[in-house]
């Protein structure tokens, strides 16, 4: 069932989204050569809890981390580890959900470790641009298919692909709510967007094919061809004045 949130509730989701965005801004500055993904995870948890929030990923269906930290060919759900040390030229996606006063915000960025190569840099740029192409379609009267079509159509000319097995979602008082928001679709198809809906649009884009493998830990998802992937996400409120991004970073 799709939940329609009141303007007061959306402000509470926005507060959670602000803490989510602030946490990502802090983490982006902390990303450097030689740091482990577990160190980033610990920094995120401390930051979130010190501001009255809860890192919702921690313990979710048994996930051990406060963030998902996915490096290079890991597309999503990378478990933070003391053994995963960032190297120059790596790319890392940092995905997190924050609960604040009973409401949730969800966002993800993919950033380079220092300078990365041109192919990786283009992948990051195109993935973020595809996110905003999808966001432009998040208006009352459009459909979920309009969003997915915009995302996929944006990345295809670069030879990239989008994951089919993992999608965006509604959000609010739960981390994952209806409707699902795929990164592919047919214009005019799928659930119709209404004012008061809150959704997460999150392109998961592969440099090569979208075939994936789940790691033995049961969480990390890597590209089958070993090529890099990128992941960007915002929490969006559907309003009569256009899409409102609730997780914008300063």
Task: Give the label of every model feature segment.
Residues 1-250:
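Active-site neighborhoods and metal-handling regions in enzymes and metal-associated proteins
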